[in-house]
A protein has these predicted regions:
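Solvent-exposed, well-ordered loop and adjacent helix/strand elements within mature globular domains
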Residues: 1-127
Length: 127
């Protein structure tokens, strides 16, 4: 696949991690996939009906691999937009922030998500 340099909107963004209850579906109606599904802001803050800022199915490729606690391979650089998060854009994240699904809520997955924490200055490309 041919990759180009990231657009300015995807430079120096925030990345976080989340877990969800068993059986939870994403904003787009799919079941999230551990360490693959990404949630993004809505197009219009406070209006989930506006859709996701990055369209459903957008592939996110981080310029540098991210260390994902609990992930078998340790590092990963590709994620898929399937969910919406921070609907009111009230958490102070960058405009093109994304949130990586770390699995079903539980002591180990919650711990891994918390350990991942908030990553700043993450640049990525989308396809």
């Amino acid at each position: 696949m041919h990759r180009t340099y990231p657009l300015p909107s995807t430079l120096k963004q925030n990345v976080t991690a989340y877990t969800a209850k068993s059986g939870s579906k994403t904003y787009h109606g799919t079941y999230p996939t551990k360490y693959r599904t990404a949630a993004v802001h809505p197009k219009t803050c406070g209006k989930p009906s506006s859709g996701t800022k990055l369209k459903y199915g957008t592939q996110i490729y981080t310029v540098n691999e991210l260390y994902l606690p609990g992930f078998a391979n340790g590092y990963k650089d590709d994620f898929l937009v399937e969910d919406m998060g921070d609907v009111n854009c009230s958490k102070g994240f960058s405009p093109y922030w994304f949130d990586i699904y770390f699995g079903v809520k539980g002591s180990s997955t919650d711990k891994n998500a918390k350990t991942f924490g908030l990553k700043k200055n993450v640049s990525y490309e989308t396809y």
